């Protein structure tokens, strides 16, 4: 899980989702997991 100021899709399988006001990226590749902090 990377915590970043700006979250972006890294590959085609990444999905940007909003969960309780937190922007997250979920992906099959666990290295691509991000959250906005």
UniProtKB/Swiss-Prot annotation:
Domain of life of the source: Bacteria
TM helices/strands, residue ranges: none
Keyword hit for Ribonucleoprotein: yes
Pfam families in the cross-refs: Ribosomal_L36
Gene Ontology cellular-component annotations: cytoplasm; ribonucleoprotein complex; ribosome
InterPro entries: Ribosomal_bL36, Ribosomal_bL36_sp
A molecular function (GO) term: structural constituent of ribosome
UniProt entry keywords in alphabetical sequence: Ribonucleoprotein, Ribosomal protein
GO biological process, one term: translation
PANTHER family: 50S RIBOSOMAL PROTEIN L36, CHLOROPLASTIC (PTHR42888), LARGE RIBOSOMAL SUBUNIT PROTEIN BL36C (PTHR42888:SF1)
Protein family according to the UniProt entry: Belongs to the bacterial ribosomal protein bL36 family.
Official protein name in the record: Large ribosomal subunit protein bL36
Organism name: Acidobacterium capsulatum (strain ATCC 51196 / DSM 11244 / BCRC 80197 / JCM 7670 / NBRC 15755 / NCIMB 13165 / 161)
Lineage: Bacteria, Pseudomonadati, Acidobacteriota, Terriglobia, Terriglobales
Gene transcribed to yield this protein: rpmJ
């Amino acid at each position: 899980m990377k915590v970043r100021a700006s979250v972006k899709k890294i590959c085609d399988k990444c999905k940007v989702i909003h969960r309780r006001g937190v922007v997250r990226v979920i992906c099959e590749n666990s290295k691509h997991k991000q959250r906005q902090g």
